Amino acid sequence: MALLKLDIADVRNIESASLSPGEGLNLLFGANGSGKTSLLEAIYLLSRGKSFRSPQSGRIIRFDRPCLTVSGSIGRPGAGIAVGVRLGRSEKEVRVGGRSCDSSAQLIRLFPAVLIHPASVALLEGPPRWRRQMLDWGVFHVEQGYLDLLRRFSRTLEQRNAVLRGDAPGSSLAAWSGELARWGTMIAELRSSYLDRIRMHFGEMVSALLGRTDVELVVRPGWRAGWSYADALAASQPTDRRLGYTEPGPQKGDFAVLVGGRPARDYLSRGQLKLLTYALLLAQAGLLEADQPGRVCLLVDDIASELDSRNQERLLSLVKSTGLQSFVTFSGATQGVAAVVGRTARVFHVEQGRIRTGS
């Protein structure tokens, strides 16, 4: 069980709401603009300390209020941990177990939530940094010291770039290059290992959603394939000096999704690409659940967006089969929902920011 109780205050059009979700499927019904997505946004805030819809807190806080508050209990019945996020227009407070935290890292580790929504397709269509963020979030949950490793690499990269620009007289480019190669190689190896572990789950999800077996994940470390990072830095040194910054490295890392050996985004329809993205995110959730049973939460917004009824039912059936605590929003026609979920789901109705338990 991940989320035992949720209390929301002043998140967009939700003035005040409380709910006790079920441990499996939680279905949220309501018209467009009713507050369904805002409810998912509140859960995401409780998991990551930030919104997935806007980086500007003023757009998330109810228009006439100074701040928003989302709090809840995470864990198992009788042993829940109190967590909370208070977000003002220029400040944020995160609390875990009644104590303030310096960052959201403890919250993220305690309550991992995976989000699937219509814009998730940008994960495959968008820039590499979004795919790096997905990888790094996943590695963070399986490697205890990964966040510190990323910070070490970032600091060392800044130092090497300063030498390249001539802003650090007396510093040795060779020394910083050696340090950078050490941290960068470790990051690339951890990302590659993580992607290897996702592949099995991903293949199962792709088969269930698209019926394909010719989809593969290919890692790109951020430098020439087959080279060590140290060799790539040495070869790139003249270019780096001219540019004033370090060109190769995990800061340029990426991964590709190929279908029949071709980039998925150049081969599949938008609906198929969306299903492929959902398969990737479900695979990430499945891997994390295998490592940390009972702690993962799945958020699925607007399941009907750009999917026909058959694919909606496939996706909902797959979400149900994961056994994860899941929150799924619906608007409009929902004829196939009952046939897929039976009587196992907990149902909520959202109307103008108010939430009530239904059937």
From Swiss-Prot:
GO biological processes: DNA replication; DNA synthesis involved in DNA repair; double-strand break repair; SOS response
Keyword field contains ATP-binding: yes
Primary subcellular site in the record, as a coarse category: cytoplasm
Family matches, as InterPro entries: AAA+_ATPase, DNA-binding_RecF, P-loop_NTPase, RecF/RecN/SMC_N, RecF_2
SMART domains the UniProt entry points to: AAA
UniProt GO MF annotations: ATP binding; ATP hydrolysis activity; single-stranded DNA binding
Keywords, alphabetical: ATP-binding, Cytoplasm, DNA damage, DNA repair, DNA replication, DNA-binding, Nucleotide-binding, SOS response
UniProt binding sites for ATP: G30, A31, N32, G33, S34, G35, K36, T37
Subcellular location: Cytoplasm
Domain of life per record: Bacteria
Family to which this protein belongs: Belongs to the RecF family.
NCBIfam families in the record: recf
Function: The RecF protein is involved in DNA metabolism; it is required for DNA replication and normal SOS inducibility. RecF binds preferentially to single-stranded, linear DNA. It also seems to bind ATP.
Protein name per the record: DNA replication and repair protein RecF
Naturally occurring in which organism (per UniProt): Methylococcus capsulatus (strain ATCC 33009 / NCIMB 11132 / Bath)
